[in-house]
Each structure stands twice: as structure tokens, then as C-alpha cells.
């Protein structure tokens, strides 16, 4: 397929069919998401769409398929009622909501999720709509948005174990898939990482370096991933004869990692190894260690988690446990589109395996 296959005017289905060497009907089925087309033919058609520059008429397609060709990508927060702050009194301000949004955009993890979702949707003529659902009102808006057909389904990245949004969507009969296992039993598909195995890799690496006074900066313990990483780390340390390991809880931010590292150094000045439950906190830990004159990794070895851009920006570059976020986000999207094509299919889960990436910090 070459550029000379482009039409002089706007590319048509016939142009795509000619470029792909298939029938117009086959092209139509692929573009409209019909499942009974051989995957190899689907890929040929998608390449032909790219080469010809064909753009489906969304309005006409929507009339036929009753689809919006859009997916809501929802970052959902804690189950805090509108009118109540984190302590259960007072009111949530615009600043509270702004800080939630700012934290989302500051974390490289969320950018990687968006990349994985967009890369999967774009070749299929679909696009994501980013939404935030950190309050009751915002969650109601997400449900209403889906009910009115503005998006075909939802991809949910939940930041709190008590998040009620997955339950609200399943009760409403709306298609949704989660990034990470739900904290409560909900009949909903999800993708996740074997977090405990990842923490085991981190602990074993520190022990293999002859670190013996090892501490951990955990993630927030109201988040399943934070709980699982801490459990995996503790279990591994206990199996190797270290039943007690100092813990300082963080919030998956660089600032919280810095504060946690300060607390650990004050209480355990002789520590020689640190496992931070994400890379931002690992970066914060390295910064504080340098300020206290501790060399990384000669005096204190540090291992992070995620293999995000923060790991490369860290000084020295951070040894970390890789979470294949882009691949996980793409699989989450595939599960949602499969659910849309087969509404009665049962909920399922896909668990990815972590990998240790060794760099300069440990």
C-alpha cells in the first residue's frame, strides 16, 4: 500500500477496500467493530485506513451502530460525600478538588495509562474522554454521561479502596473495566499486577546486595496496591529472617516519600536499604538521603516500583520493579470493547507479571 492509492477527494470506503484488497462490506465490518473478521484482515484494513487517510463519518456511523465511539477514562477518588471533608465535617473546596487533579497530572503513572488507552482506541476510530470523579456529584455526572450515551463505557482508575463508582456502574448495568483489582467484591472486569511478587523481587534484590537494615516506604494503605506491595515485602523479609522491618507510609507522591524518608532516618539512622512502593517516593527518598550525606547506593540502596519516568529522572537512576502500565491499559481497553461487543459475557481479570529493572540506586 502506497500514497498513490489516496483519492483526489476525501477517501471513501471503496478506497480503503481497494488498498486493503478486500470487499467494501469487510471494511465496513472492521470499522464498525464487528467481531467475526479474521484478526489478520482487521490489521490489513486498519493499515489501509491509515494509508488512505479515511475518516469515518461519525454521525452516520453512530446512527447505524448506536455507539458514541468514545470511552470515558475516569480517575475516581475516595468515597467522600459532597459537603464533607476528609475528616467528615466542613465542606470540600475547589482547592480540594484542584489538589486531586494536580496530584493525578503530577504522577507519571496516569500519563502512561492515557498512552496505553489512546494507542489502543485510535486505530479503531475511537477516542477517550477524560473525567474526574472525586466527589459524589462528579460520580453522578459520570453515571449520567454514560446513561445518555455520550460514551459507550468506562475505564476506571480508582485511587481509593472505598471508591463506590465501580459498584454504581455495575448496578446501573453500564459497561466498565477497572485498572486494579476492586477492594470489594464487584462483578466487574479488571487488569492488575502481581504486586506481591513485585515487592518480593525488590526485597530479594536488596538482600542479595547484603543490605540487612532495610526499611520500606509503603504506599497509602487504603489502596489495594499499597496493601499488596507492603504484604509482599514483609512476607519476603520474614522468610529471610527479618520479621520486623521499619515502615513509613507515603501517598505515592515525591513529597510524601521525602517526609517518610526523614522519619525513617530519624528513627533508624543505621539503615542500609529502602524499598519505596513507587518511583516518585523512591526519588524523594534519594533526595533526602543526599541531603543527609548518605551515598546511594554505597551507604543506602534504594529500590522503587513502577519503572516510570521518575526512575530515570532520579539521581542516581532508580532500580525499580517494572509495571507494564501501557500494556495493562491497552488490555483494560480491549476488555471493555469486548464487553461492549458481548454484553452478557462474564466479568474476567488479567494479571500481569512484574520485572526487576536494575539501575544505579541498588
Which residues does each predicted region cover?
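Short gly/ser/thr-rich secondary-structure transition/capping motifs
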Residues: 51-57, 135-139, 286
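Structural motif corresponding to alpha-helix initiation and N-cap regions
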Residues: 10, 56-57, 139-140, 162-163, ...
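Alpha-helical recognition/docking segments in bacterial nutrient-uptake
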Residues: 5, 70-204
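Short acidic/polar active-site loop segments enriched in Thr and Asp
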Residues: 23, 69, 127, 152, ...
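N-terminal helix-turn-helix DNA-binding module of bacterial transcription factors
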Residues: 1-70, 362
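Generic structural signal for helix capping and beta-alpha/helix-loop junctions
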Residues: 34, 66, 81, 138, ...
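Bacterial carbohydrate/catabolite-sensing allosteric modules
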Residues: 2-6, 19, 51, 116-124, ...
Amino acid at each position: 500500500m502506497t500514497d498513490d492509492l489516496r483519492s483526489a477527494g476525501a477517501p471513501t470506503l471503496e478506497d480503503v477496500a481497494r488498498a486493503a484488497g478486500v470487499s467494501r462490506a469487510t471494511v465496513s465490518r472492521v470499522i464498525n467493530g464487528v467481531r467475526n473478521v479474521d484478526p489478520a484482515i482487521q490489521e490489513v484494513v486498519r493499515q489501509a485506513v491509515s494509508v488512505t487517510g479515511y475518516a469515518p463519518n461519525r454521525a452516520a456511523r453512530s446512527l447505524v451502530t448506536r455507539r458514541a465511539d468514545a470511552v470515558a477514562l475516569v480517575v475516581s477518588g475516595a468515597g467522600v460525600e459532597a459537603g464533607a471533608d476528609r475528616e467528615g465535617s466542613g465542606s470540600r473546596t475547589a482547592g480540594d478538588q484542584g489538589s486531586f487533579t494536580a496530584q493525578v497530572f503530577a504522577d507519571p503513572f496516569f500519563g502512561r495509562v492515557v498512552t496505553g488507552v489512546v494507542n489502543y482506541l485510535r486505530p479503531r476510530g475511537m477516542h477517550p474522554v477524560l473525567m474526574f470523579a472525586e466527589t459524589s456529584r462528579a460520580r453522578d455526572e459520570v453515571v449520567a454521561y454514560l446513561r445518555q450515551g455520550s460514551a459507550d463505557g468506562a475505564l476506571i482508575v480508582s485511587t481509593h479502596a472505598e471508591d463506590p463508582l465501580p459498584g454504581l456502574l455495575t448496578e446501573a448495568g453500564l459497561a466498565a473495566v477497572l485498572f486494579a483489582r476492586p477492594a470489594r467484591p464487584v462483578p466487574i472486569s479488571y487488569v492488575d499486577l502481581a504486586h506481591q511478587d513485585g515487592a518480593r523481587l525488590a526485597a530479594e534484590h536488596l538482600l542479595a546486595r547484603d543490605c540487612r537494615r532495610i526499611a520500606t516506604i509503603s504506599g497509602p494503605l487504603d489502596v489495594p496496591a499499597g496493601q499488596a506491595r507492603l504484604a509482599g515485602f514483609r512476607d519476603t523479609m520474614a522468610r529471610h529472617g527479618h520479621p520486623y522491618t521499619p515502615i513509613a507510609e507515603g501517598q505515592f507522591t515525591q513529597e510524601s516519600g521525602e517526609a517518610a524518608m526523614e522519619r525513617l532516618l530519624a528513627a533508624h539512622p543505621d539503615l542500609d536499604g529502602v524499598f519505596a512502593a513507587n518511583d516518585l517516593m523512591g526519588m524523594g527518598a534519594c533526595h533526602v538521603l543526599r541531603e543527609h550525606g548518605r551515598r546511594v547506593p554505597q551507604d543506602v540502596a534504594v529500590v522503587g516500583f513502577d519503572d516510570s519516568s521518575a526512575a530515570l529522572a532520579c539521581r542516581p537512576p532508580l532500580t525499580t520493579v517494572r509495571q507494564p502500565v501501557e500494556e495493562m491499559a491497552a488490555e483494560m481497553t480491549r476488555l471493555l470493547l469486548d464487553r461492549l461487543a458481548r454484553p452478557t459475557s462474564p466479568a474476567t481479570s488479567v494479571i500481569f507479571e512484574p520485572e526487576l529493572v536494575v539501575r544505579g540506586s541498588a
